[in-house]
Swiss-Prot record:
<dbReference type="GO" id="GO:0006302">
    <property type="term" value="P:double-strand break repair"/>
</dbReference>
<feature type="domain" description="Helicase ATP-binding">
    <location>
        <begin position="499"/>
        <end position="656"/>
    </location>
</feature>
<dbReference type="InterPro" id="IPR003711">
    <property type="entry name" value="CarD-like/TRCF_RID"/>
</dbReference>
<dbReference type="InterPro" id="IPR011545">
    <property type="entry name" value="DEAD/DEAH_box_helicase_dom"/>
</dbReference>
<comment type="similarity">
    <text>In the N-terminal section; belongs to the UvrB family.</text>
</comment>
<keyword id="KW-0547">Nucleotide-binding</keyword>
<dbReference type="Pfam" id="PF03461">
    <property type="entry name" value="TRCF"/>
</dbReference>
<feature type="short sequence motif" description="DEEH box">
    <location>
        <begin position="609"/>
        <end position="612"/>
    </location>
</feature>
<dbReference type="InterPro" id="IPR037235">
    <property type="entry name" value="TRCF-like_C_D7"/>
</dbReference>
<dbReference type="GO" id="GO:0006270">
    <property type="term" value="P:DNA replication initiation"/>
</dbReference>
<keyword id="KW-0067">ATP-binding</keyword>
<feature type="domain" description="Helicase C-terminal">
    <location>
        <begin position="677"/>
        <end position="833"/>
    </location>
</feature>
<dbReference type="Pfam" id="PF02559">
    <property type="entry name" value="CarD_TRCF_RID"/>
</dbReference>
<dbReference type="InterPro" id="IPR041471">
    <property type="entry name" value="UvrB_inter"/>
</dbReference>
<dbReference type="GO" id="GO:0016787">
    <property type="term" value="F:hydrolase activity"/>
</dbReference>
<dbReference type="InterPro" id="IPR004576">
    <property type="entry name" value="Mfd"/>
</dbReference>
<comment type="similarity">
    <text>In the C-terminal section; belongs to the helicase family. RecG subfamily.</text>
</comment>
């Protein structure tokens, strides 16, 4: 009722400075009313901020920055004597917040002089994290004369200094790291946390460090807010405030859970609801009927543009309507009239880069070399070769063997990724055994690729059941989803529709994480088949999945006349059901492999979920069932981009990488384990009638943990699940847990990644330090998939037992709930879920031997080779030039940044890409020096040589030798033996050769 009540209040006179609402959704609706009816009032929207007092704010970092940004905006508007109002979820107003003096910003002006040490100190006291690389808000870096600052709720800026003078200010893109062209004259730098000086910073730091709070990071980011004392204020008391009735209910509920003292809210005025005023929720398909029903009311219709407005008017009786082009979302009814909007809220997608660099090479990590196999990356080292300095990666192999890999050949290695429980073994250098192993794997991969291509070719010859995909009912079906489709879902639906309406049978793989909306996309296809008179089968590997899909489909198709049935080992009257399927009395049949023997009257579509989990015989039966019908396979296992491209030569691939708009990242807490904390975590979830995953990765002691939990919380209903429990019993336990008959699932790992358990929204991970970064991220992703917020607790037995690297990793996970869906994550997901079954045949043995990256690359090559595509060039050019060439540490001080650039340069496929990286280096680090420029020339030579079939470039003094793959040699003479002359002579010659070749 927020919009209609607020509209009424505005008409009666409204001079409040704060409006507290139930949640962000209600706040958003209220802001629309203020913005439309009081356009001169600055309406500032606060985020939800569900931190409880003394919570570690790293887990709420993004919202905390937004909250401080909104508050700073409010103080500035008051200072400028501008009429303003804060509209906030009540959760954002429950704690005292910083006064104006703690949120002061400062300016940096072009051509002014600044002491860089003082600037660095100031940013540090303002809460900025000083790092090598700036990627997210609240970070800054100082690299010689170049300073990067990413201001919260603002933009990322790059400043260039000449001595102390600021000679350039530009924005830069934190994802590409490249600055934009336009120069700025002045920028404003707000604090990330609070505007403190050295003295006030030290005072606050001391208060935090001396507090008894349980945390691994007793710093201002985590706890500063709770110790501001008189420098913070209760906004609801200081400024004239009013709350919505639903916000009052929220306060009362929190009070009933003893999380809040109700007394401090008693003085607040409550926004009144009144008769004749109500908020509306009208779906597009019901609009015409609604307007006809209210023809005696004055109706105001809002639309984002003239086209949408004209289309609406032509379909409606516009006699009593006032039409307005405005972007606001207003849907409410008053005694005087009705407001209806054709607009919807636009969720701004944050372009964000993952801070958790999963593919970063760190010393001590396992790597696999294309020719020499599995070893351990030791360090980045510099050696003199032929009297010149070059950089190498040192890789340790079996025994005392070491390989020095020139950095220009970094593309020959990849991080070793197999299954997370497999322990790699080092290979021995010089025995040739790894090359034999590769040859064996290649033979097997050619066999697999051949089968895939053969099947695709067979299916390609079959005429498909052509469907009409432009039916109006499909649009109505979409509008009843209850949520907005993501752009990925829209794209996948369009791709599937194109397949269904062609003359060929569809063969498409739909991949996407659990909760990303694969089932909705599949249901759209099933409904399309139904409208065209065809039956569909949805085949799943487990009874629990069958049960879940059946409930989902039954609810979704309830009003659309689709008859849905389920066939699994629990289904009663199987024969009767099979007869109904044969007679065409069932439109969509869902079930386990029990479906595979069913006879259909008019089967048009087969959808399979998690196909790789079926056995060999079941896969054969599946192939038979789907032989001449449209086939859609769904998988929660992501596919790395390059393999995706190779597979797309022979089958359709759609990927869902965007989470649903209302999905919130799970809150993550890193804590030292104790009994009180465990009780608090479990009760916190039970109070909201939820369930808990408790991960304890040690079967031998799992019963002890169960006993301990039962001692702490008597009557707690706990189920145990681990790999030694047989499949049927495991499934039974999961079914009981899904039904809510257990409160805690105590297990060694979440056995079934594809299962959606919307009521389990807290996960506790015992001894989190023993898990890999990707495992922890995966486990965290198991909660927070429904409407409720997820909570993830990484518990450590003893803080002192953690090394610095492990602590850093865990703190990074705590602060960064976002993880990019890039290539590295796909590999790591495969590591956890076991990528061995990716193509339906278990290949985990081969993957264990050669690692996932090399395996997929070889598979891509096999597919390209057999389907007549382009095979990658495997030859590496050997560079034996007496030239000093490396990325200079004086220019790029950080080893990890240099290593990243080396990796990217080694992967360049053309000289344009090298030129782009050259520009980027100058932009990010300053003018490039001779040594770094010479390394870029070496990379350019390597690319040109590859194009000409050259395998080696070498020199002795000014005499240069070029060796071709057919052993032919060519000699050149440079003007001198200087590095520059050698490189220029070679570049000029190779470019001329390529020009001749192109003629």
């Amino acid at each position: 009722m927020i919009q209609s009540s607020l509209y009424r209040a505005l008409n009666k006179g409204f001079d409040y400075q704060i409006l507290a609402c139930k949640d962000f959704k209600e706040s958003e609706l209220a802001k629309e009313v203020i913005s439309y009816f009081k356009p001169n009032t600055k309406a500032i929207l606060f985020p939800e901020f569900r931190a409880k007092k003394n919570d570690d704010l790293r887990s709420f970092f993004e919202e905390f920055l937004q909250l401080l940004g909104g508050l700073r905006e409010f103080y500035q508007a008051l200072e400028n004597k501008q009429e303003t109002i804060i509209i906030a979820p009540i959760s954002a107003l429950l704690h005292p917040l910083p006064k104006k003096e703690l949120l002061e910003s400062f300016k940096i002006t072009l051509l002014e002089k600044y002491n860089l040490k003082d600037l660095k100190d100031k940013l540090f006291y303002y809460g900025y994290e000083i790092l090598d690389l700036v990627e997210v808000e609240g970070e800054a870096s100082f690299r010689g004369d170049i300073v990067d600052i990413y201001a919260p709720n603002s933009k990322a800026y790059r400043l260039s200094f000449f001595d102390t003078e600021c000679e350039s200010i530009k924005e830069f893109d934190p994802i590409t790291q490249m600055s934009l062209k336009e120069d700025l004259l002045e920028i404003e730098i707000p604090p990330t946390l609070f505007s403190l000086d050295e003295s006030s910073y030290k005072d606050l730091k001391t208060k935090v460090e001396q507090s008894p709070l349980n945390s691994f990071s007793k710093d201002l980011t985590s706890f500063g807010l709770w110790f501001l004392g008189e420098k913070a204020q209760d906004l609801l008391i200081v400024y004239k405030s009013i709350i919505s009735p639903r916000a009052l209910e929220e306060i009362q509920e929190l009070a009933s859970l003893n999380e809040l003292d109700c007394e401090r809210f008693k003085f607040l005025k409550v926004l009144e609801n009144a008769q004749g005023y109500e908020d509306l929720e009208i779906h597009a398909h019901a609009l015409e009927g609604f307007i006809a029903l209210h023809s005696n009311h004055k109706i105001t219709l809002l639309a984002p543009n003239k086209t949408i407005l004209d289309n609406a008017i032509s379909a409606l009786d516009a006699g009593n309507m006032e039409c307005v082009i405005a972007p606001f979302v207003l849907n409410f009814k008053t005694p005087d009239g009705i407001f209806i909007s054709l607009n919807s809220f636009e969720r701004k997608k944050k372009r964000q880069k993952s801070k958790l660099a999963l593919n970063e090479l760190n010393p001590g990590e396992w790597v696999v070399h294309d020719d020499y196999g599995v070893g351990v990356f030791s360090q980045l080292v510099q050696h003199s070769v032929l009297g010149s300095k070059r950089d190498f990666l040192e890789i340790a192999y079996l025994g005392e063997d070491k390989l020095l890999l020139p950095v220009e050949n970094l593309h020959l290695i990849a991080r070793y990724v197999a299954q997370s429980d497999s322990v790699p073994a080092k290979d021995r250098l010089g025995k040739g055994s790894f090359l034999k192993l590769k040859a064996k794997v290649r033979t097997k991969l050619l066999e697999i690729a051949s089968k895939i291509i053969e099947l695709a070719a067979e299916r390609n010859l079959i005429l498909g059941k052509k469907m009409d995909v432009h039916l109006a009912e499909l649009e109505v079906f979409k509008s009843h989803a209850g949520f907005e489709y993501t752009s990925d879902q829209e794209k996948a639906i369009a791709e599937i529709s194109k397949d269904l309406s062609s003359h060929r049978v569809m063969d498409r793989l739909l991949s996407g994480d659990v909760g990303f909306g694969k089932t909705e996309v599949a249901m759209h296809a099933i409904f399309c088949a139904f409208l065209n008179g065809f039956q569909s089968a949805l085949v799943v590997p487990t009874t629990l999945l069958a049960h879940q899909h059946f409930e989902t489909l039954r609810a979704r198709f309830e009003n659309f006349g689709v008859k849905v049935a389920r066939l699994d080992r629990y289904a009663s009257e199987k024969n009767k059901l099979l007869k109904a399927v044969e007679l065409g009395q069932v439109d969509a049949l869902i079930g386990t492999h029990a479906i595979l023997g069913a006879k259909f009257k008019n089967l048009g579509l087969v959808v399979v979920d998690e196909e790789h989990k079926f056995g060999v015989k079941q896969k054969e039966a599946l192939k038979e069932l789907s032989k001449s019908v449209h086939f859609l396979s769904m998988s929660a296992t992501p596919i790395p981009r390059t393999l995706n491209m190779a597979l797309s030569q022979i089958k359709g691939i759609s990927s869902l990488k965007t989470p649903p708009t209302d999905r919130k990242p799970s809150r993550t807490f890193l804590k030292e384990k104790n009994d009180e904390l465990l009780k608090e975590i479990i009760y916190r979830e039970l109070r909201r009638n939820g369930q808990i995953f408790y991960i304890h990765n040690h079967i031998a002691s799992i019963l002890k943990v169960k006993t301990k939990l039962e001692d702490l919380i008597p009557k707690l209903k706990i189920a145990i699940l681990h790999s030694q429990i047989n499949a049927n019993e495991s499934e039974e336990i999961m079914l009981e847990f899904a039904k809510g008959n257990y409160q805690v699932l105590l297990c060694t790992s979440i056995v079934e990644s594809g299962i959606h358990l919307p009521n389990a929204n807290t996960i506790i991970i015992d001894n989190a330090q023993n898990f890999g970064l990707a495992d922890l991220h995966q486990l965290r992703g198991r909660v927070g998939r429904g409407k409720k917020e997820g909570f993830c607790y990484f518990l450590i037995e003893d803080q002192k037992s953690l090394n610095e690297q492990a602590l850093k990793r865990l703190l990074a996970l705590e602060k960064n709930s976002y993880l990019g869906s890039g290539e590295s994550v796909a590999y790591h997901d495969l590591e956890i879920r076991g990528g061995g079954n990716l193509l339906g045949q278990d290949q985990s043995g081969h993957i264990k031997n050669i690692g996932y990256a090399l395996y997929t690359r070889m598979l891509e090559d096999a597919i390209y080779e057999l389907s007549g595509g382009k095979k990658r060039l495997e030859k590496s050019v050997e560079i034996q030039l007496g030239v000093s060439a490396f990325l200079n540490p004086e220019l790029i001080a950080s080893d990890s940044l240099r290593l990243d650039l080396y990796r990217r340069l080694s992967l360049c496929e053309n000289t344009d890409e090298v030129g782009q990286i050259h520009e980027e280096i100058e932009d990010r680090f300053g003018k490039i020096d001779d040594l770094s420029a010479q390394f870029l020339q070496i990379i350019t030579l390597k690319i040109l040589a590859n194009q000409l079939g050259i395998i080696k470039l070498s020199n002795f003094n000014q005499n240069i030798t070029i060796t071709y793959s057919d052993e032919k040699k060519e000699s050149l003479k440079a003007p001198s033996k200087d590095d520059n002359d050698i490189l220029e002579t070679l570049l000029k010659h190779l470019r001329a050769q390529i020009s001749l070749k192109r003629r």
